Amino acid sequence: MSGQALAQLEGVREDAGGFDLLAPDGTQYRVDVTDGVFDPHNPLLAGYVAGRRVVAFVGPTVDRIYGDRLRAYLDARLEPGSWSVHTIDSGERNKTLASVERVCAIAKASGLDRHGVMLAVGGGIVADIVGFAASMYARGIRYIKVNTTLVGQVDVGVGVKTGVNALNTKNMFGAYHPAHASLNDPALLATLPAREIRCGLAEIVKMAVILDAGLFEALEEHPDAFLRSSDGALETYVVRTSMRLMMEELCPNLREHDLARLVDFGHTFSPVIETAGGHRLEHGEAVAVDMALSAHLARLLGLADAESCRRVVTLLRRIGLPVFDPATCTPELMTQALHASWQRRGRELHLVVPTGIGKATFVERLEDVPAEVLRAALDALAREGRTS
């Protein structure tokens, strides 16, 4: 196909079964939405791994809930002796190089060659660990994700980044390694605890604030989405809209050649909130605090009106997410977070702040966030946090 023809196909295309992405650099991958992913009559997963050795990895909770169904599916659809399932520790504290090495050791002991497939079944942490292992094993092999959490389906499951924490820094080591396929079954979300759902909703709020006022308004009307009895129509709209928005935003800049990214809303202060807090807050909870702080900064810097700021913070609170963490939301630590982001982003701040609902901009320089403004934003959040 000619370069001109490829250029015409670039972008994200949605169909009834999911999304296809073709990036300007030629990277392409599929994100599927399917019912009954572990039903032996569903050929989707088997079709992606046919004729290859498969080494699957699951966390303990996923193994307890879905392990039997996963094994029954692989047993029914794949050749005997061509697959194995292994449990690995999940949780942010296990997102380490040691976990990646363990995955690679299991793969080697299982006879996985360069034509084999690593299968990650779980949330974002399992996907990050297994994806990073796949990027290095035999200089890079195919891997597939079955995303079982809301964060996994709307965030980790639609991008190409993998990584682990190291040197007291979140995602210090990692690789851009697109999954061969990313499979999402809405029914898998039904077994999630409320806290996991809320963390996923934080990432959805992120996309709504920066890109889609309609999605934001839907969440304002139903902050209990995924936690209520319903026919699932709203939840389908929310998940698919979030997936599409994220993929469309990632596509032109898949490997982050441009470090100014709107999807980094909520991800400037949150790495320090997570790390300094000993991962007491989940990732989505730290992102929520970051978004609330960024909304107040936008208000104080004259980039957003008070009503937009109020709506962002109020929605987060109505969902049940924190908007302030006394142990980490100190001027000292949040200044440290700004400097760390400035350094990580090529000595440009690229702080994403809302300018309204469904739109955002960047604060580019450290000096554009004066110490007194940061302190005032934290004071405002502290007052709101006390009334939660």
UniProtKB/Swiss-Prot annotation:
Its EC number is 4.2.3.152. Keywords: Cobalt, Lyase, Metal-binding, NAD, Nucleotide-binding, Zinc. NAD(+) binds at residues 92-95, 124-128, 148-149, 161, 170, 188-191. InterPro entries: Dehydroquinate_synthase, DHQS/DOIS_N, DHQS_C, EEVS-like. CDD domains: EEVS. GO terms for biological process: antibiotic biosynthetic process. The keyword Metal-binding applies. Pfam families: DHQ_synthase, DHQS_C. GO terms for molecular function: 3-dehydroquinate synthase activity; metal ion binding; nucleotide binding. The keyword Amino-acid biosynthesis does not apply. Its cofactor is NAD(+); Co(2+); Zn(2+). Gene3D superfamilies: 3.40.50.1970, Dehydroquinate synthase-like - alpha domain. Zn(2+) binds at E203, H267, H283. It catalyses: D-sedoheptulose 7-phosphate = 2-epi-5-epi-valiolone + phosphate. Belongs to the sugar phosphate cyclases superfamily. EEVS-like family. Catalyzes the cyclization of D-sedoheptulose 7-phosphate to 2-epi-5-epi-valiolone. Probably involved in acarbose biosynthesis. This is 2-epi-5-epi-valiolone synthase. It comes from Streptomyces glaucescens.
